[in-house]
């Protein structure tokens, strides 16, 4: 077979290749390429191993040098792979039901808030919000309705929290709020009361109308703990004290 025939077969073979492929000679001359490569805008032929094109797609460029000094360039669309990786990262740090940060991300946000407070000589408040009698309600309504109720609770609580603060799902019927950069403890009580008011409004689940309440425990950095673990533990103790004293109230640790 002549060189011309070999080249013709090569061009035909890669013409309909599913990825963008280009074969170049040692002097950089384009010998053959797939239709997909030919259709690429030059701006989409980046030099980086992975890059985002002008139209938003993620592409991976692989370049292999041949024995004769030529090269094979492969550009693969990895947009779906990137989306899957982003989804996996999101799930690693967020609750699947509510979309809120999970305990893992909560711990990280607490550490960040404490570091900021130490630099600026401020306080950090950790609030644990436990819904009163939710388990019995969940058993009565069914888990599907209970999940819908928890999503609505999460949305209402989120509306009470500043962007700089963190609302997380800490347990089945428990939410945590980290209020950072506090100057005064009274500001934390205002936040707690807003959370209670948000839950006091009537809920609708299917054809049912429901009322919810919550017991809230609060701990403060640095007075009640020097790290996130201590703050969460003491907020939990304060929350249980609120339940012991009749529920539907706010209690500060040690008070």
Predicted feature descriptions by range:
Residues 2-8, 82-94, 100, 104-111:
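Sensory-domain boundary/capping and coupling elements
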Residues 1, 65-80:
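PAS-family sensory domains
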Residues 3-30, 35:
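Sensory modules in modular signal-transduction proteins
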């Amino acid at each position: 077979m002549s060189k011309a025939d070999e080249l013709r077969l090569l061009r035909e073979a890669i013409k309909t290749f599913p990825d963008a492929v280009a074969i170049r000679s040692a002097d950089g001359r384009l010998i053959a390429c797939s239709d997909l490569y030919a259709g690429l805008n030059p701006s989409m032929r980046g030099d980086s191993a992975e890059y985002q094109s002008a139209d938003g797609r993620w592409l991976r460029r692989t370049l292999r040098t041949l024995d004769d000094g030529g090269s094979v360039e492969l550009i693969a669309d990895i947009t779906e792979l990137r989306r899957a990786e982003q989804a996996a990262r999101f799930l690693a740090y967020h609750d699947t039901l509510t979309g809120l940060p999970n305990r893992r991300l909560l711990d990280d946000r607490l550490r960040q808030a404490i570091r900021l407070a130490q630099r600026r000589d401020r306080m950090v408040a950790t609030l644990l919000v436990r819904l009163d009698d939710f388990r019995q309600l969940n058993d009565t309504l069914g888990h599907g309705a209970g999940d819908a109720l928890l999503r609505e609770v999460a949305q209402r609580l989120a509306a009470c929290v500043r962007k700089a603060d963190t609302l997380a799902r800490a347990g089945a019927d428990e939410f945590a709020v980290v209020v950072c950069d506090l100057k005064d403890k009274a500001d934390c009580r205002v936040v707690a009361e807003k959370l209670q008011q948000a839950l006091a409004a009537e809920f609708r689940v299917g054809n049912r109308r429901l009322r919810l309440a919550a017991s809230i425990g609060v701990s403060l950095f640095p007075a009640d703990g020097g790290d996130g673990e201590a703050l969460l533990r003491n907020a939990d103790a304060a929350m249980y004290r609120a339940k012991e004293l009749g529920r539907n109230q706010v209690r500060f640790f040690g008070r």
